[in-house]
Amino acid sequence: MDIRKLFLDYFASKGHAVYESMPLVPDDPTLLFTNAGMVQFKDIFTGKVPAPTNPRATSCQLCIRAGGKHNDLENVGYTSRHHTLFEMLGNFSFGDYFKEQAIDHAWEFVTEVLGFSKEVLWVTVHESDDEAFELWQKHVDASRIKRMGDKDNFWQMGDTGACGPCSEIFVDQGEEKFHGSEDYFGGDGDRFLEIWNLVFMQYERSSDGTLTPLPKPSIDTGMGLERVAALKEGKSSNFDSSLFMPMIRKVEELTGKPYHYESGASYRVIADHIRSICFLLAQGVNFDKEGRGYVLRRILRRAVRHGYLLGLNAPFLHEVAEVVCGQMGDHYGYLKEKREHIKRLTFQEEERFFATIAGGMEVFKKELEKTQSVFSGEAAFKLYDTFGFPLDLTEDMLREKGIRVDLAAFEACMKEQRARAKASWKGSGDELKEGDFALLLEAFPSNSFVGYEKEAHTSKLLAILNRDYKRVSSLGAGESGFVMLEETPFYAESGGQCGDEGELRARGRIVAQVQGTKKYFGLNLSRIEALDEICEGETLEAVVSRERLEVQKHHSATHLLHAILRQKLGDHVAQAGSLVEKDRLRFDFSHPKALTHEEVGMVEEEVNRLISLSIPSRTREMRVDEAKASGAMALFGEKYGDLVRVVDFGEASVELCGGTHVENSAHIGSFYITKESGVSAGVRRIEAVCGMAAYHYGKEALQEIAEAKEILKAKELKLGIEKLKEQVRELKSEMSALSSSKSGAISEGVMMGETRVIVETLEAGDIKNSIDEIKNRYEKVAVLLLQVKEEKVMLAAGVKGEDRIKAGAWIKEIAPILGGGGGGRDDFAQAGGKDASKADEALQSAKNYALERLA
């Protein structure tokens, strides 16, 4: 039974538009991941955007709850129905049908399409919702309808805003399976399982708690696919269903051990976590030290650790990923397209963690032996800081033994990192909460952008904010703030393209310089510095800076670059971020390794070839589904409306894009890659210049070459460099010979058994080279040399073929005598000191140290 298809087809037959699952990374700074089906319709429910033409919608939404407010990670594997990734089936009405039809649809689908017996179905409603109680009685006997309080049956998005009562449908799994004291309807047991939540959004809650009926109430429902699938297959646990057993069977194959539910938590963790790993990697999230990438890393490391418990001591998750891509790739086609990319990045991250997990587990076991009930916070921090064990992974390991971590001590160790993290968020938007944006949104729901067609436009000045985002009626000369034009030609920063700069003109002169443009809560606002008084309500001429053309050149170049990277490196390449400015571009993309010098050159040449073909650009507006069907590249993480702009340069590049572009590829001029580097695991970065910036880059490069030739006194730079390299080689050879002669002059020391001990002052030469020369001369030797240069002291020690003396420990013992410090490996160490007057004392102590250990 394909429940996903049955659900979408059913609601399509009821006049609902079918929406694709939105990206797991939402265009919403308040959310870490998409965690509910209604997220992609949030702006409609809150009134920020108007309802679509068809006010009925349905979707099967991928959701992740692992990190942030909604975090199920620690429960996964230990319960029958917690998951990091799940699919939420939902139907939505935006001011169209309400309770009666929502209830009728739900009942019909559950009983007639899914085939659940009416005898096993129960319903809850809010204690005050008499209307829902009456409507349900058309389908269910009143004895099977239970009234519940706000905690269970009232839904709200936040402290204020849209909210309303909800109604839930439950399935009775049978008394014969579940018969604990909590297994009654409304209890905390597992006998009665909720499968569908119908939210009746009918109120607006004000700041004082007052509920005001909405003029057009809406419907938001959610049904967990995994839970319904398990019930339809007669399974008590989601993990026993056909959605998870293929991954569990693969783990059985890899371990050679059979899965049993009672002891199979590790199998369930792996089966769950690999789904999240596959989808996040496919959608452009990469392993990282912070943010979403860190959550992904935690998920993988938790799965690896559970594999380690099962005896898997080498990378294995990439093999389980193959199963996920095969099983779910028919509905989510990009899993098959990105299969090799997913497996490669998973394998690489596993390798990194397996390199440290054994050492970390050793530290964990030793600390555990000393632990009664509380695990050392310092040890937990060491596991985190040195071995890459996230705190929740350590807690997970201890949970099985009934032990907790000393969180206070752990937090004390983390204090410095937390302070740095807090500092990095400074200015990230908290000050905006104090601004007057609510007043602007109430007075002017939006302002329109007209800059695609024109770069100068006369418009009314609707509102002014000062630099603290407070609304004011005017700004005087020298004051800075923000302006909202009724129609603006200034492009607001978006999609990596910087916001437009320019001028505001009135009364025959320039009255303000526009220094940038951004969207704030959907409003296009330009940051300005006033040169003369400007007032709300007056008419201004807005003129975009000519530098926008240079920005457009760089933006169009990123499209061509993206296309060439996919063509030359593979379809796994996906945009992971970009920055487009007037004098440079930066393009981040998914790729597992650094580009070779030849690959960089090839990419640069191919982009320039497309530029030289003088390909006209074309911009079209079309429905998002039509655009994707036509082959236009859509980027994960981007939020698209019903209508989208498609920008193409012939067949070379076709992308969904809201930015501004050149009219012809030839207008880009030329394209030079200035740098290729890594951003994080699996993400590379190309920096480049084009247009006038490319001209200046080339001119400066030629100037540097001319200056270098002048310095080298060479007509050809390459010949001059080769000559210089030869001179350097000769000088190094002379220095090495000199160093060897000096080290040869050092005494042969004393023999202690079979080991030669040399402790001497080095008058001249390189101290490290001298140590190496002496070590090469003898089979067993412990040597420490001291050298004084300009009142500073250098110490170096080397040990070969002798375990009783460690060079690092030797140096640490002697360096303090000279007022310094240092250290190193067992075979070589060095240090510096400040007090040259103690040189003789230090040498004597060094001799005594060696002789005592070899006696």
Curated annotation (Swiss-Prot):
Gene Ontology terms: biological process: alanyl-tRNA aminoacylation; negative regulation of DNA-templated transcription
Sample GO molecular function, one term: aminoacyl-tRNA deacylase activity
GO CC terms in record: cytosol
EC number: 6.1.1.7
Cofactor(s) of this protein: Zn(2+)
UniProt keyword annotations, A-Z: Aminoacyl-tRNA synthetase, ATP-binding, Cytoplasm, Ligase, Metal-binding, Nucleotide-binding, Protein biosynthesis, RNA-binding, tRNA-binding, Zinc
Signal sequence extent: none
Pfam families per record: DHHA1, tRNA-synt_2c, tRNA_SAD
InterPro entries: aa-tRNA-synth_II/BPL/LPL, Ala-tRNA-lgiase_IIc, Ala-tRNA-ligase_IIc_anticod-bd, Ala-tRNA-synth_IIc_core, Ala-tRNA-synth_IIc_N, Ala-tRNA_ligase, Ala_tRNA_ligase_euk/bac, DHHA1_dom
Keyword Aminoacyl-tRNA synthetase included in the entry's annotation: yes
Residue sites binding Zn(2+) per the record: H555, H559, C657, H661
EC main group: ligase
Reaction catalysis annotation: tRNA(Ala) + L-alanine + ATP = L-alanyl-tRNA(Ala) + AMP + diphosphate
Cofactor note: Binds 1 zinc ion per subunit.
Major localisation: cytoplasm
Lineage top rank: taxon: Bacteria
Subcellular location(s) per record: Cytoplasm
Database matches in PANTHER family: ALANINE--TRNA LIGASE, CYTOPLASMIC (PTHR11777:SF9), ALANYL-TRNA SYNTHETASE (PTHR11777)
HAMAP family per record: Ala_tRNA_synth_B
Free-text comment on this protein's domains from its UniProt entry: Consists of three domains; the N-terminal catalytic domain, the editing domain and the C-terminal C-Ala domain. The editing domain removes incorrectly charged amino acids, while the C-Ala domain, along with tRNA(Ala), serves as a bridge to cooperatively bring together the editing and aminoacylation centers thus stimulating deacylation of misacylated tRNAs.
Family: Belongs to the class-II aminoacyl-tRNA synthetase family.
Function recorded in the entry: Catalyzes the attachment of alanine to tRNA(Ala) in a two-step reaction: alanine is first activated by ATP to form Ala-AMP and then transferred to the acceptor end of tRNA(Ala). Also edits incorrectly charged Ser-tRNA(Ala) and Gly-tRNA(Ala) via its editing domain.
Protein name listed in UniProt: Alanine--tRNA ligase
Lineage of source species: Bacteria, Pseudomonadati, Campylobacterota, Epsilonproteobacteria, Campylobacterales
Gene for this chain: alaS
